[in-house]
């Protein structure tokens, strides 16, 4: 049991430090808001990652600009990436951490066991979509609002 707790804690440390913030960034005057719908239940939490470019997308967490955890209520969630971000193209990846273990669970062949989603509602066919399929433009001022629907397999 202690080993599992230590492993889970170690995995949480791999999330970039800015990601330790939660959804309270809404008090800031600008940023990116992601409305997420289609959860199959309200268990666990919503993990949201903001990517500033194609490098490492979507698997190398070291290239994530910001990661946050948000609650799920009535099959909906909202990720608020508040703060000053320069104008440019960004992408968002999300997952429904149903068991609240801080990671995206998959089976031994990589088949998703939890829900996930991408900005632009890009679909994963035999592989994850590319950054170009998921990117959206943020002009660097005010709030950019996007919507994503969760996918379950």
Predicted regions mapped to residue ranges:
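Bacterial N-terminal signal peptides
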Residues: 7-16
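Sec/Tat signal peptide C-region and signal peptidase I cleavage site
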Residues: 17-25
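Extracellular beta-sheet/turn segments enriched in Thr/Pro/Gly and aliphatic residues
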Residues: 25, 115-153
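A short, amphipathic beta-strand motif
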Residues: 30-38, 48
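Short proline/glycine- and polar residue-rich coil/turn motifs
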Residues: 70-76, 137-140
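Exposed aromatic-hydrophobic patches
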Residues: 78-84
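A short tyrosine-centered beta-strand micro-motif
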Residues: 88-94
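Acidic, glycine-anchored loop motifs typical of Ca2+
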Residues: 98-106
């Amino acid at each position: 049991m202690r080993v599992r707790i230590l492993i889970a804690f170690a995995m949480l440390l791999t999330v970039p430090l800015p990601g330790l913030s939660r959804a309270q960034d809404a008090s800031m005057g600008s940023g990116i808001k992601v409305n997420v719908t289609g959860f199959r239940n309200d268990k666990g939490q919503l993990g949201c990652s903001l990517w500033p470019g194609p490098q490492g997308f979507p698997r190398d967490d070291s290239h994530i600009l910001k990661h946050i955890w948000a609650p799920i209520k009535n099959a909906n969630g909202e990720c608020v990436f508040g703060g000053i971000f320069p104008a440019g193209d960004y992408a968002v990846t999300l997952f429904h951490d149903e068991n609240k273990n801080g990671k995206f669970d998959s089976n031994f062949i990589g088949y998703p066991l939890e829900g996930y989603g991408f900005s632009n509602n890009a679909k994963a066919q035999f592989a994850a979509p590319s950054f170009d399929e998921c990117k959206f433009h943020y002009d660097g001022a005010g709030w950019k609002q996007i919507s994503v629907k969760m996918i379950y397999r």
